[in-house]
Amino acid sequence: MTQRDLSYDRYCDEVTVQTGLLRQALAGADLQARVPTCPEWTLRDLAVHVGGATRWMNEIVRTRASAEVPDEAVPEFAGPPVEDGPGALDAWLAEGAEAAAEALREAGPGRKMWTWSWEQSSSFWARRLTQELLVHRADACIAAGVPFAADAELAADAVDEWLEIVAYVQRVQPADPAGELRGGGRTLHLHATDAAPGAHGEWLIELTDDGFAVRPEHTDGATVELRGPMTELMLAFYRRLPLTGDAVEVRGDRSFLEFWLERATFG
């Protein structure tokens, strides 16, 4: 299903790049501000979640874990005390990212280890951590009121990975809301309007009896089309941008798009 045009080395690099950009978004922001796209979190909660996830993945990769690692077994998982201030939080984020990137590089692609997914290797974690950081950086930028931008290839890969995750959830958790994304032959077309010629920027998602199928192709006859610049398209697909407004355009049956977005979840 996935394109996965990005290399393992690129993912390793992005762990520190995306963390650095996240730290920039947090610098000087009110860490007690609520995150509109994750309303149960403050900005500090988001930072601790991301930093803890980074250290958790690092521990799995570093130890070549054969089973899930509990949070309490991860050094400094919970982050520094609040009273230590934003400088300590920033340093903790930076150190965790550097350690995770180093562990991934040392492991190399395809190294066998536990994951919660269909792919039991370091390659899964390199990609998953990159996209975890990218999307939560968007959350942080929205909360801090600063601009968010993403490389088009990285944003397209975020869409690809999300589709893989939703398909996996359908297979292993059939009672999950994602299980309702099947049947009827309805189609959802995603169209990045700023994609360069030959670049990956279109997805045709078709509901089938077994779930859904994805093809990288254009159509003018989809049940609904979501279109816009690649970054905004990705954010809307991840429910980080509203479907109203000027950022993206919906053509066709909006209710089907909303049906998809409400059920394309996991966790």
Residue ranges and their predicted role:
Residues 219-267:
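C-terminal interaction segments
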Residues 30-72, 116-173, 233:
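Short, contiguous alpha-helical
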Residues 89-137:
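Hydrophobic alpha-helical segments and helix pairs
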Residues 10-82, 87-92, 96, 100:
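Active-site-proximal cofactor/substrate-binding loop regions of enzyme domains
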Residues 162-205:
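A glycine-rich beta-turn/hairpin centered on an aromatic-Pro dipeptide
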Residues 3, 68-75, 111-117, 213:
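Conserved catalytic-core motifs characterized by acidic clusters
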Residues 1-13:
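N-terminal export signals and maturation junctions of secreted/periplasmic proteins
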Residues 193-230:
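Acidic/His-leaning functional-site neighborhoods
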